[in-house]
Amino acid sequence: MGIVVIGAVFVDIKGYPLSTYIPGGRNAGRVEQVHGGVSRNVAEDIANVELRPTFVGLVDDTGMGLDVIEKLNNHKVNTRFIQRVPDGMGTWLAIFNNDGDVCAAISKRPDTTPLIRLLEEQGNEIFRDCDSIALELDLEKETVKQTLRYAKKYGKKVYAVVSNMSIAMERRDFLQQIDCFVCNQQEAGLLFSDDYGHLEPEEMCRVLAANVRSANIPCMVVTMGDKGAVYAQADGDCGIVPAKKVDVIDTTGAGDAFFAGTVIGLTYGKTLAESCEIGSRLAASVICITENVCPRFRPLEFGLDVPVVD
């Protein structure tokens, strides 16, 4: 059944200035509304590498909810386990500056408690034959527990990402059961109660290696924007993955694409360094387009011997 992705769906409302952005002032520009959410983006990114993921999540019981399901279906994502419920989708409102970076954002999270019952009733069917699990860590605590129980039952690897680190901090103890956790530099600072914003990759790599050992986290990757990413494992292996040099149009979804690429690599036999390299390529492909997901690739472009199933 491919990689199972579990998480929330958002509607992204994005504003772009037509001239020089004035913080605190009125800015003429354009406003776009697109399907978003970390996990939804990750599922579509995986599908765009001609793999066939399964998305487990919720959408609104409205026309917009149907649109989300239809788009995922068009990208060959298995949507059998998406439920339509009231308040099933969140909203993310973001303002971008002239460099394509988010300068202000606010989000309304959806009610994801119906996922608990969904996993109770269909968890065995969802996880039994999957290749691995990609989990949004800031879901309901019970949903995270259920997922980890099924992963242990069926011997599946679990890879985690966050959309709200403040909420994910309440699930910090679960990181010891996660095969690889991916977050950005700011989120890593919150996780370890420190400020890493001034660190260069070499120093960040050393700090991360020490932290994963002391916190007993099996594996962790920290993205650092245009400085690339660093990774570290509890066994002492660590390294740096340089960023790809591309012209920035819109950074939305770059972190999600990096996570998707890393999960793809780790699931289908690549080393952690090779997997992060796939993530870096997918992230670069998102940054230089207006979409918040990567364009189409084939597995062989990343050295993956995975059959493409139509």
Could you tell me what each predicted segment is?
Residues 71-86:
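A glycine-rich helix N-cap at a beta->alpha junction
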